[in-house]
């Protein structure tokens, strides 16, 4: 009986740890001539996890958040160790606004208009590439449907 309980406990811990360690789907996006390899957070659990607990991210990698509805979504940086910039996008992938975010803060960074997507990149990535509000992120149409 103790072996069964131990095995059940290990199985439960594995299931609880799985979302944080699970591979998210990836998508290739473009911003002007710049290629982005983005993990896709299309369900509630992956949107809540986001980039929490990450210690590093490659220069042209990011995370695309796919929301079920266009709203004035907000992001924060609780348990996020990387300084990030977030671009809020409309349904066609047009950048509404870009916000810089500091690690481990709970300040809200919100879309200035209803957004269907948010793209998080290393802090300063958009500014460094000359990417500004009004420009379009390509490849958004290939993103999975939100859940």
Q: What residue ranges belong to the model's regions?
A:
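Juxtamembrane cytosolic interface motif at the C-terminal end of transmembrane helices
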Residues: 17-21
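Compact, glycine-rich, soluble single-domain proteins
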Residues: 22-147
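Bacterial N-terminal signal peptides
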Residues: 6-16
């Amino acid at each position: 009986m103790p072996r069964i309980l131990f095995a059940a406990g290990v199985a439960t811990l594995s299931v609880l740890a799985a979302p944080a360690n699970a591979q998210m789907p990836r998508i290739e996006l473009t911003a002007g001539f710049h290629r982005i390899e983005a993990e896709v957070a299309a369900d509630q659990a992956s949107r809540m996890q986001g980039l929490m607990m990450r210690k590093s991210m490659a220069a042209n990698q990011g995370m695309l958040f796919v929301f079920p509805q266009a709203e004035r979504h907000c992001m924060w940086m609780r348990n996020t160790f990387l300084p990030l910039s977030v671009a809020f996008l409309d349904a066609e992938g047009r950048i509404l606004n870009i916000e810089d975010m500091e690690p481990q803060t709970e300040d809200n960074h919100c879309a200035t208009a209803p957004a269907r997507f948010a793209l998080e990149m290393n802090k300063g990535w958009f500014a460094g590439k000359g990417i500004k509000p009004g420009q379009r992120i390509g490849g958004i149409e290939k993103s999975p449907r939100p859940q």
